[in-house]
Amino acid sequence: MSFLNLQNKRFLVMGVANRKSVAWAITQALEAQGAEVIHSVRSAKRLESLKKLMGERSTYCCDVEFPEQIEALAKEVGEHHGTIDGIVHSIAFANFSDGLKPFHATLRKDFLQATSISAFSLVEVANAFKKLLTNEASVVSIGISSTDVTAENYGYMAPI
């Protein structure tokens, strides 16, 4: 047994995009300690692209831009898995569909969407799952340190 005591604990990890994702590294670390990991990904398309990587792991779709999908995820996880011991929110999004622009050219709607998905969704997830969390559960968010990045590298995501 490790000092983390994660054996037989159950976690929801949100945001696996590929095998290089921080969320995937967290999955591997949790599983190595004996934890059960449930996943949520943004879309059915993403789920399909991750089929081989995810194997038999429980994986659900949830686009956190839509609160009703967060509520539906909590309901489904509760029905299939019961309580959970922690949530890892490793989700970030920025609309770069028009290409990378200078920071000062960021549109308000794009900045607010990025903030809603990348940051505020943590609040909505915690609220939706509060009845499923064990008394000693933890909810964590993974982000970048804006002291180590510049607007040139991350565009308007740097301050988020």
Language-model regions, residue ranges each:
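Canonical Rossmann dinucleotide-binding motif of NAD(H)/NADP(H)-dependent dehydrogenases/reductases
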Residues: 3-38
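Conserved hydrophobic beta-strands of the Rossmann-like cofactor-binding core
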Residues: 10-12, 84-92
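Residues at the C-terminal ends
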Residues: 28-32, 79, 134
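Conserved glycine-rich Rossmann-like NAD(P)H-binding loop of the short-chain dehydrogenase/reductase
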Residues: 33-49
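Rossmann-fold cofactor-recognition segment
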Residues: 54-68
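Conserved Rossmann-fold cofactor-binding substructure of NAD(P)-dependent oxidoreductases
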Residues: 65-80
